[in-house]
Amino acid sequence: MITGASSGFGAACAEKFASHGYDVIITARREDRLTKLKKSLESKYGIKVLSLCFDVQQMDAVNKAIGSIPDAWKKISVLVNNAGLALGRDSFDKASMQDWETMLNTNVHGLLYVSKAVLPLLMAQKKGHIINMGSVAGKEVYEKGNVYCASKFAVDALSKAMRIDLLPHHIKVTSINPGAAETEFSLVRFKGSEDQAAAAYDGYTPLTAEDIANTVYYCASLPEHVCINDLTITCLEQAGTYYFNKE
């Protein structure tokens, strides 16, 4: 099951798992994109896709969608908590409170709502794997990152807490922390400004959505007794959040 599957990391993860024969549950807010992805994956790989359209920010909608999953789909082996976003790149004093609320509601509350709703299915199986999409911004704060960084620090802490608390239930928890990756992320962050979004990747080759999907699949495909707890991945020309070797 993959949240935020309508684009970027989520769509690439759905493609990766489907290419290895997994049936996949894809979720997002944009139903048209989910429908298109479902048709593509089923046609290309001959697998089954269950599409659930909901906003992870809405707890009732999350619970209703997860509660509607047919019995045949309830044996979820991997949950990829991918839904997330950044909005704006402003200093603390100038940033939008509405942007802050949307980031916290999506990146933190959304992860909690989905995890809490899916967890009983994993516990009933006494196995499963929760993969949370963190960020290098959850490891090191950067200028004008403020609440986005805080939301990803929360993902980092929650991943560690979940790993400990779910240990008796044989459930793996992994936090994957990407650096700069060229998806719709910057376009969303800069609210549709293509120039600003493109400038974020000037002078170096960033990660791709496929790079992250490969990493997610690698973590999920290890032997049952192996769990990668925390993995940070950047492109060659990035170290941490600040340091880039740009041409």
Show the residue positions of the predicted features.
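C-terminal helical subdomain
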Residues: S175-I176, T183, D195-T241
